[in-house]
Amino acid sequence: MTDFFAGIPQIRYEGEGSSNEFAFRHYNPDEVILGKRMEDHLRFAVAWWHSFAWPGGDPFGGQTFDRPWFGDTLDLAKLKADVAFEMFDILGAPFFCFHDADIRPEGATFAESKRNLEEIVDHIGIRMEGSKTKLLWGTANLFSHRRFMSGAATNPDPDVFAWSAATVKGCMDATMKLGGANYVLWGGREGYETLLNTDLTREAENAGRFLQMVVDYKHKIGFQGTILIEPKPQEPSKHQYDYDVATVYGFLKRFGLEKEVKLNIEQGHAILAGHSFEHELALAASLGILGSIDMNRNDYQSGWDTDQFPHNHPEMALAYYEILRAGGFTTGGTNFDAKIRRQSLDPEDLVLAHVGGMDTCARALKAAARLYEDGSLETARAARYAGWETPEAQAMLASSLEKIEARVLAEGINPEPRSGRQERLENLWNRFV
């Protein structure tokens, strides 16, 4: 036991009437919604990097957090893990996520970093034996170190490609050893700053080959989890190749991997791409590649990825409605890829941020489930497209332009526009949130 969270009680569900800030008002893990426990719908995860590795810096200033585990030794990394599992237990968090660089100190060589990762994974495994918290997904940090400044899989230097591939292998091994449900790839440096020095064709081909190697290794070692790509349009790169759901799907189709890889979709990244979160979720579901989500929010005035904790349950309800329509999570879940503000220095701030985020998502899920169970929205959606269920409409899809023209002329088809009834549906939505 450490004393970092001393005095902070275990967070329990007390209901909407509670005035206890260290309690859940909406998140009741055992509440059954649409035949499934709330915990199993939401599958919350704590992000190791923002919660325990981020020092509180920004582009204009450095570290503001003074954590007792900050440093580059394995002993401090183990202390960080001990503190992390204490918070997981306080929250009753069912899952966590990590990058390799979050959990182990960087070595002077690849071999040393590999040994450090293996040792800390063993330590985390021991902590997991005494905890209910499991691993939602692992990933490799292929963007922070200067060696990755020109990318990892898309780097012009073959040695960086090799280092990156070896790193991913080790992280996949670690994820499998810890029983992870997924493995994530995020290409923060897989993009370009200027076209003047960029070979787009080569970089795409190398990225495709890299991903194929990941899929091949998954099958070779018998990893039963899902490989996930996380889209983001820019930041840190000027233009990232995994721009949004549609772009990544095109990439997967290009290399024949659309049946092997799904997506981890982040709210903040969707906003940066000029989309709503629910748009990206609905599109991924329609393409069969919805895997998991990173839950956070952006400051809409800032124009960059602020990674704040979710606070707007009507907005989140739109997202969870699309997840329910898609059948819910299988291996995926709700990872809080969110960080407290750099002025929020106290241990209590870290716990309460997660309490608020979990309550916001639970409230959103309940609203979405009420509307989904009511069925009114789906009835209206089906009615709008009912004409396509007729034999004539189905036959037309198997016809030709010439035959369709002949039918239009013969039957004197002259369609009248029909209302989309958007305002009615928005009013319906508001009744449930």
Curated annotation (Swiss-Prot):
The entry's localization annotation reads: Cytoplasm
Traced from the root, the source organism's taxonomic lineage reads:
Bacteria, Pseudomonadati, Pseudomonadota, Alphaproteobacteria, Rhodobacterales
Task: Tell me which residues bind Mg(2+) 1.
Answer: 230, 266, 294, 337
Q: Name one GO cellular component term.
A: cytoplasm
- Which parts of the sequence bind Mg(2+) 2? 266, 269, 305, 307
Q: What is this protein called?
A: Xylose isomerase
Q: Which reaction does it catalyse?
A: alpha-D-xylose = alpha-D-xylulofuranose
What is the protein's quaternary organization?
Answer: Homotetramer.
Task: Give the annotated active site.
Answer: 99, 102
